[in-house]
């Protein structure tokens, strides 16, 4: 490998030789600076040999390699900030790593990032990639009775939802602007995995599907499996009660919806360029405050929403609401710099398996759970002047395609005609 910067120490060259993935010239320079920065820190603490041993042997049974934890948990390398364990795991193991949500520390790691100690371990072999759990197939009895018409779907559009604030126990992330590396998705901020799990999983339904009820034991049971679609969600943008622009189809595991005027791409849905002849002054003012908007992650069968805007976002997620024991229509305020788990595939799978035992209508009602509504800047509900989502100036609706298609297959197996599942707006 040719020297990128003059006077590259031999140890840095050796470590760069183990780098994964191909980068352009600018990115190669940044990688070298990241390695030089780490080498400089480890020389002072005598851990350099252990780093080289871990990288060259690719062995988990190496020691923790630690650097001091900064105040906000991030490491700055050449005007770019990121979480240190993510930076070095991406550099030496997974060049396609998007976020710390994709990493889980090994049990043997004594200074894992999520432990919030004064030192943080950056040994890339002390972390493992979170794998998407395989969802068990739903066993569906084949019914002969086809419903004459679909039951009415629970519709939260015209009721006044309750309001709640960001769940206590989740620390807000530091809201420091960052410059993502070219071709990479930027890391999100600092949230303790332990705290996230403790708070988010409270009240979760039992994740093991219930066995079929005795009444179904003698029926012909057909397994209906979950299939991951090419586009994990579809996003529609609304101003008041009018849909604006085309539906965005998300294929990337991390993408943003923002208020800027850049052309949209697979990782960004930019609302700034969308025109609407009926746009009023209130909508125009709100659009100016969307800013960096919201980042959506789909990782390990879970969906997270992170507020990047300087103003709060407001989320109505029936799946999240069930986890907390709230009313299904509750709207949760997410302050700037915080993120919230808004959907969990395993929880949905358990609910679907239980609902099959309760009949067609119970399964059909889960359609509403696959739709998430989110408003920018202005909230709605009982505590706000605007009491319905269609009264908010700027909002989006997410349709989770995998769960919706799974529902469609289950309903078809139960005896319904094939339908296009959608929410009632």
Curated annotation (Swiss-Prot):
GO MF annotation, one: promoter-specific chromatin binding
Domain MH2 as annotated: residue spans: 232-425
Pfam families: MH1, MH2
Cited Gene3D superfamilies: 2.60.200.10, SMAD MH1 domain
Consequence when changing residue 74 to D: Reduced interaction with JUN. Loss of transcriptional activity and cooperation with JUN
Site residues by UniProt (Required for trimerization): 40
GO cellular component: chromatin; ciliary basal body; cytoplasm; cytosol; heteromeric SMAD protein complex; intracellular membrane-bounded organelle; nuclear inner membrane; nucleoplasm
Sorted UniProt keywords: Acetylation, ADP-ribosylation, Aortic aneurysm, Cytoplasm, Disease variant, DNA-binding, Host-virus interaction, Isopeptide bond, Metal-binding, Nucleus, Phosphoprotein, Transcription, Transcription regulation, Ubl conjugation, Zinc
Location in or out of the cell: Cytoplasm; Nucleus
Positions bearing the Glycyl lysine isopeptide (Lys-Gly) (interchain with G-Cter in ubiquitin) cross-link: 33, 81
An example Gene Ontology biological process: positive regulation of protein import into nucleus
Major location category of this protein: cytoplasm
CDD domains: MH1_SMAD_2_3 (cd10491), MH2_SMAD_2_3 (cd10985)
Residue numbers bearing the Phosphoserine modification: 204, 208, 213, 416, 418, 422-423, 425
Description of post-translational modifications: Phosphorylated on serine and threonine residues. Enhanced phosphorylation in the linker region on Thr-179, Ser-204 and Ser-208 on EGF and TGF-beta treatment. Ser-208 is the main site of MAPK-mediated phosphorylation. CDK-mediated phosphorylation occurs in a cell-cycle dependent manner and inhibits both the transcriptional activity and antiproliferative functions of SMAD3. This phosphorylation is inhibited by flavopiridol. Maximum phosphorylation at the G(1)/S junction. Also phosphorylated on serine residues in the C-terminal SXS motif by TGFBR1 and ACVR1. Acetylation in the nucleus by EP300 in the MH2 domain regulates positively its transcriptional activity and is enhanced by TGF-beta.
Result of altering residue 53 to R: Slightly decreased monoubiquitination
InterPro entries given in the database record: Dwarfin (IPR013790), MAD_homology1_Dwarfin-type (IPR003619), MAD_homology_MH1 (IPR013019), SMAD-like_dom_sf (IPR017855), SMAD_dom_Dwarfin-type (IPR001132), SMAD_FHA_dom_sf (IPR008984), SMAD_MH1_sf (IPR036578)
Extent of Polar residues compositional bias: 165-177
Bridged cysteine pairs (disulfide): none
SMART domains: DWA, DWB
Top-rank taxon, per record: Eukaryota
Record's comment describing the protein's domains: The MH1 domain is required for DNA binding. Also binds zinc ions which are necessary for the DNA binding. The MH2 domain is required for both homomeric and heteromeric interactions and for transcriptional regulation. Sufficient for nuclear import.
Protein name: Mothers against decapentaplegic homolog 3
Organism: Homo sapiens
Upper lineage: Eukaryota, Metazoa, Chordata, Craniata, Vertebrata
Gene that this sequence comes from: SMAD3
């Amino acid at each position: 490998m040719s020297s990128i910067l003059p006077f590259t120490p031999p140890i840095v060259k050796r470590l760069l030789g183990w780098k994964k993935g191909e980068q352009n010239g600018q990115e190669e320079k940044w990688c070298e600076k990241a390695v030089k920065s780490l080498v400089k820190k480890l020389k002072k603490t005598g851990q350099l040999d252990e780093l080289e041993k871990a990288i060259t042997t690719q062995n988990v049974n190496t020691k923790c390699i630690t650097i001091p934890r900064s105040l906000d948990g991030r490491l700055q390398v050449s005007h770019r900030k990121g979480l240190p364990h993510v930076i070095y795991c991406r550099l030496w193991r997974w060049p396609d790593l998007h976020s710390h949500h994709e990493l889980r520390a090994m049990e043997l790691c004594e200074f894992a990032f999520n432990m919030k100690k004064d030192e943080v371990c950056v040994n890339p072999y002390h972390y493992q990639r979170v794998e998407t759990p395989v969802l068990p197939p739903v066993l569906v009895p084949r019914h002969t009775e086809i419903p004459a018409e679909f039951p009415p779907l629970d519709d939260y559009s015209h009721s006044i939802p309750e309001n709640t604030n960001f769940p206590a126990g989740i620390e807000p992330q530091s809201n420091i602007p960052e410059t993502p590396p070219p071709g990479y998705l930027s890391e999100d901020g600092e949230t303790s995995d332990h705290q996230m799990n403790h708070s988010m999983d409270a009240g979760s339904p039992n994740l093991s599907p219930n066995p079929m009820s005795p009444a179904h034991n003698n029926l012909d049971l057909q397994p209906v499996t979950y299939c991951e679609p090419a586009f994990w969600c579809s996003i529609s943008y609304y101003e008041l009660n009018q849909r604006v622009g085309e539906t965005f189809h998300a294929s990337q595991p991390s993408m943003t919806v923002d208020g800027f005027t850049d052309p949209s791409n697979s990782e960004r849905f930019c609302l700034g360029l969308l025109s609407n002849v009926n746009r009023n002054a209130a909508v125009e003012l709100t659009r100016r405050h969307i800013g960096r908007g919201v980042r959506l992650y789909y990782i390990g069968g879970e969906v997270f929403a992170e507020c990047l805007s300087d103003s709060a976002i407001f989320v109505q997620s029936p799946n999240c609401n069930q986890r907390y024991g709230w009313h299904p229509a509750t709207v949760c305020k997410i302050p700037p710099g915080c993120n919230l788990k808004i959907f969990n595939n395993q929880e949905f799978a358990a609910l679907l398996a239980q609902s099959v035992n309760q009949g067609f209508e119970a399964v059909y009602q889960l359609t509403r759970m696959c739709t998430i509504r989110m408003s920018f800047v202005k909230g709605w509900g009982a505590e706000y002047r605007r009491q319905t989502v269609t009264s908010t100036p700027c909002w989006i609706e997410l349709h989770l395609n995998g769960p919706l298609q799974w529902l469609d297959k289950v309903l078809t197996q139960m005896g319904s005609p094939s339908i296009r599942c959608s929410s009632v707006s």
